[in-house]
């Protein structure tokens, strides 16, 4: 599933082609996604794009009459293509632009979303989200306060959008390794110093992944069709049985609630 770096990479890739251009019309080939494509999107006509923003894993296209909310789901990607390029099997939605380009949404598993809202504030998919991990609001003091009475393991807590948004399975595993914290540690057992380190590491890992265009494991592609290259820098995720790059101990993989967790027994305590 695309996580925050992949969504931010998509945002940065499509923004220069959309802002200042006008959506002439939308083409919806298959509106049966995780939620049905909003009827307002079918009827889009002559709508200039004012901005392309991101909140958590949602892309937000600001138009004069409202907002398009896009979620990439498990396997979705957005590409900027020439208008004349014919669609393929899993190309479900196009925004045809005034500059001769098309924003094309591809989603083999159809678990993404294209929604419409007049006002962002209060929309149900955005209403209960925690702070952005790259913002000043997410810091060691905040994390320590939120962990203090939490009797659950730190890794699933990091992946809870009510704590902080966009830290999915890959980046939770990588950040905990970089901070030397075992993923099964109780959140309440973390000291303030550990929380300060973990908050800094999460920011650093996410920023590095954004620099590398995100992580491509299977489906994700950048807006220009290229993969994300952070997969080449993964320290533990997807490396079961391979030697730790720090100490040489084989990486361990466990599964909790259908989620794979990767860690080093030696480096993470």
Curated annotation (Swiss-Prot):
Active site: 2 (schiff-base intermediate with dna), 3 (proton donor), 57 (proton donor), 259 (proton donor)
InterPro entries in alphabetical order: DNA_glyclase/AP_lyase_DNA-bd, DNA_glyclase_Znf_dom_DNA_BS, Formamido-pyr_DNA_Glyclase, FPG_cat, MutM-like_N-ter, Ribosomal_uS13-like_H2TH, Znf_DNA_glyclase/AP_lyase, Znf_FPG/IleRS
Domain of life: Bacteria
Binding site for DNA: 90, 109, 150
UniProtKB keywords: DNA damage, DNA repair, DNA-binding, Glycosidase, Hydrolase, Lyase, Metal-binding, Multifunctional enzyme, Zinc, Zinc-finger
ZnF FPG-type span: 235-269
A GO term for molecular function: class I DNA-(apurinic or apyrimidinic site) endonuclease activity
Function: Involved in base excision repair of DNA damaged by oxidation or by mutagenic agents. Acts as a DNA glycosylase that recognizes and removes damaged bases. Has a preference for oxidized purines, such as 7,8-dihydro-8-oxoguanine (8-oxoG). Has AP (apurinic/apyrimidinic) lyase activity and introduces nicks in the DNA strand. Cleaves the DNA backbone by beta-delta elimination to generate a single-strand break at the site of the removed base with both 3'- and 5'-phosphates.
Family statement: Belongs to the FPG family.
Name listed for the protein in its UniProt record: Formamidopyrimidine-DNA glycosylase
Originating species: Escherichia coli O1:K1 / APEC
